Design a protein with these regions (language model features):
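Active-site mouth loops of central-metabolism enzymes
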Residues: 15-30, 83-92, 165-175, 254-265
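An alpha-helical appendage that flanks or caps ligand/catalytic pockets
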Residues: 2-9, 41, 125, 130-160, ...
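Structural preference for beta-strand elements that scaffold enzyme active sites
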Residues: 10-16, 45-46, 78-83, 108-112, ...
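Internal, glycine-rich beta/alpha segment that forms the wall or movable "lid"
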Residues: 2-11, 90-190, 199-207
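N-terminal beta1-alpha1-beta2 module of alpha/beta enzyme domains
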Residues: 1-74, 169
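Conserved, mostly hydrophobic/aromatic
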Residues: 39, 43, 51, 70, ...
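Alpha-helix-loop-beta-strand connector modules within alpha/beta enzyme cores
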Residues: 4-10, 57-84, 135-139, 302-319
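Short, acidic/polar
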Residues: 26-38, 97, 175-182, 264-274
Length: 321
């Protein structure tokens, strides 16, 4: 597939990719590259990677670097770290590395950021968790200003950062509170909602975001499955999240946030309608659950070939109303 909607564009349908930790490191990279290629073949506009450290729960320590690996393997489409943990690394480094990746892949890079909450991430990177919210509040407008080209901050002499003035990099923030969505609106970023939050909660937050002047794309993450869903493995994943998520966030989790159906047309309608109910203009699909085999992901990707274009069509039709 040669055409795709730009990074984080309204109507876009993207895929979250995760490492299969039963494989060795080299095989993990190659499998993720293969899945990124397959995602493009079935119509996904782009792919996202996300971050935790120390091999935690099948996440990556280097989501931005992995995005570069995936872009090299993909025939068009976009990729990005989403979310990258903004509070465990120097702000300037986030800006520079993202801008230079975009210099290599013009128009194909995006960035999503989060504050983080897992204690091990801070310990492994020898960064105190204390004060992390304040660090995030300080870093967010700096990253947003530099990568949007509005304000290069201290990095105006960097050629890749300077290029953002005419080629801004789309950005989003993982935000699940009223304060956080207002902060994203002020920074000119879009929103990324986690895969467990209720649709009602997401709608409250998107309404607050729009009411605060937010103009970016709101993206709903949802687990999607063709056929009978892997309910027991999904429950294992939720248990992992419960082990470190803030108690306040868990009060807004849905009992069953997986969207599944055996009929592609029905599933596409379910996904698009769910996004619309949440006030979101784009969808990010997750297939990964604990213990899933590479072959299962590939089979699901093939089965989604009739779903992804239909979801995009419905999202775009809703935006035109």
């Amino acid at each position: 597939m040669s055409t795709f909607l730009p990074p984080l564009a309204p109507g876009s349908v993207s895929l979250r990719l995760y490492p299969h930790t039963s494989l060795d490191a080299r095989a993990i990279v190659e499998e993720m590259r293969t899945q990124a290629r397959l995602a493009r073949e079935v119509g996904f506009d782009g792919v996202m990677t996300s971050e935790h450290h120390g091999g935690f729960a099948g996440y990556l320590p280097n989501p931005l670097q992995m995005a570069g690996f995936l872009l090299e393997a993909m025939d068009g489409g976009w990729a990005g770290a989403c979310p990258l943990l903004l509070t465990v690394r120097p702000t300037a480094l986030v800006v520079e590395e993202t801008a230079w990746l975009a210099a290599r892949f013009p128009g194909r890079v995006m960035l999503g950021v989060a504050a983080g909450s897992l204690q091990d991430d801070f310990d492994i990177l020898e960064t105190p968790k204390e004060g992390y919210v304040e660090r995030f509040k300080s870093a967010l407008p700096q990253v947003a200003g530099a990568l949007s080209g509005r304000d290069p901050w201290l990095l105006g002499g960097d050629p890749a950062v300077a290029a953002c003035a005419h080629s801004p990099i789309p950005m989003t923030s993982a935000a699940m509170s009223y304060t956080a969505v207002r902060r994203a609106a002020d920074a000119g970023m879009g929103l990324l909602f986690d895969s467990l939050s209720t649709i009602e909660r997401c709608r409250e937050l998107t309404d607050t975001y729009r009411g605060s002047g937010g103009t970016g794309t709101c993206i709903l993450v949802r687990r999607v499955w063709i056929g009978p869903p892997p309910a027991s493995r999904q429950a294992q994943q939720v248990d992992v999240y419960r082990s470190y998520a803030e108690a306040g966030a868990q009060t807004h989790w849905a009992d069953d946030a997986m969207l599944s159906h055996s009929d592609p047309a029905e599933l596409a309608e379910i996904v698009a309608n769910t996004a619309a109910a949440a006030g979101c203009e784009a969808v990010n699909i997750r297939l990964h659950v604990p213990g899933i085999l590479p072959e299962e992901v590939r089979d699901q990707l093939a089965a989604l070939g009739d779903v992804v274009p239909a979801v995009r069509e419905r999202l775009l039709a809703g935006l035109a109303v």
